[in-house]
């Protein structure tokens, strides 16, 4: 999803084996061939990704801003967080100016650079999958060769946004006239945009954003997860729902997510009506208190996906 992905919604999908599924030798060929489940590039949002199953080593390439992830099951890493949005000039800054639009339209409203951030993570489940040696070799290569497009992170979780501000921290920079009442420096117009995270679960060493106050990190259990193709379709195989027992998360809605910063557009339906995330992957109704991830319960997770 590149450039003008404003208003895009990716929902109810199964992604797997999208990052070089077979063993390989880390090198230039692998660098140019490695993939991920979803790639969102230099867009200003809003881009909504909800109720998906992302099982590849690399879940989301997020060289962009204005993305909301809601009720997903994620086993791969976020890559290109904070990088991948310049034109690549060798000696001077070269940020790309990309278009944003009028709300729910195709008319260009303006052009702006990417500050990164302005992302939301609500009610997701992060499960660290075993890291294949070949993927670790590639991550070591790409993470240490000065690559400013893709560092090939293979650790899952929201921790890649460590150092990004909360909304309150970001907003405080603008106190007084043009921020002159703030204790911070004059970087407020160029620093990263804020991040929101709540209701997320982390397993197998998946790592939470440092400022997520209600993250649940399970260090007791080991979650197994895979997909199986049977004669009649694809099924999820996991013990995850033997471990998740409580329904502690609230229902997320358009109002929870707010507006994407640059286009000032909400995460809503194409007709402008609000979205209430009160149904799971299969359309099962969620109670007032619900569970993170794409399914309401173990029974739902055992249904045929496709």
Model regions and ranges:
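Glycine- and acidic/polar-rich repeat regions and solenoidal domains
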Residues: 1-250
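Active-site and glycan-interaction determinants of carbohydrate-active enzymes
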Residues: 183, 248-288
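Generic hydrophobic/packing signal
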Residues: 2-4, 36-37, 44, 267-271, ...
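Short, surface-exposed, low-complexity cationic segments
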Residues: 288-306
